[in-house]
Amino acid sequence: MKLQVPRSSLKRSIFHKKRKELLSSLPKIEAKAVARYIRISPRKARAIANTIRGKSVEEAFQILAFSPKKAARIMEKVLKSAVANAENNFGLSVENLYVSECYVNDGPRMKRIWPRGRGRADIIQKRMSHITVVVRDRSKEDEYRKALEELEKKISSEE
């Protein structure tokens, strides 16, 4: 027995595939790096992430270098990785890069037992974080925006 697929969903899937192909033709202006399962509390890491968001890469490195926090060392490694990805994978120049996105998500928690008095025990949660840094090229944003507008016109004319 052959599975019947509704025509509307078939049309939509073809449209999305075509749109995805067209979007891949856009110029690459951003690179990303993710560090997962890092043994630091997300709350502590977010404090550092908030300080570098929106800053140029050079300024972000300076902020992280002078921060005494453990999260700053980790964030510095992730930022270095994102910059290397931008440089090597997409050929973006380091001088024009800025931190467009920087966020910290909760990872899994390790539960540990902490013995207390009178035979009781408390559970301590050792938290982990997933840290994501996205760097973007300021000089190519206008070019990207124009290409995106042209692409949207092309897609809307095909519908």
From Swiss-Prot:
Record note on quaternary structure: Part of the 50S ribosomal subunit.
Source domain of life: Bacteria
GO molecular function, one term: structural constituent of ribosome
Gene behind this protein: rplV
Native source organism of the sequence: Thermotoga sp. (strain RQ2)
InterPro entries: Ribosomal_uL22, Ribosomal_uL22_bac/chlpt-type, Ribosomal_uL22_bac/org-type, Ribosomal_uL22_CS, Ribosomal_uL22_sf
Record's protein name: Large ribosomal subunit protein uL22
PANTHER family cross-referenced by the UniProt entry: CHLOROPLAST 50S RIBOSOMAL PROTEIN L22-RELATED (PTHR13501), LARGE RIBOSOMAL SUBUNIT PROTEIN UL22M (PTHR13501:SF8)
Gene Ontology CC: cytosolic large ribosomal subunit
Family stated for the protein in its record: Belongs to the universal ribosomal protein uL22 family.
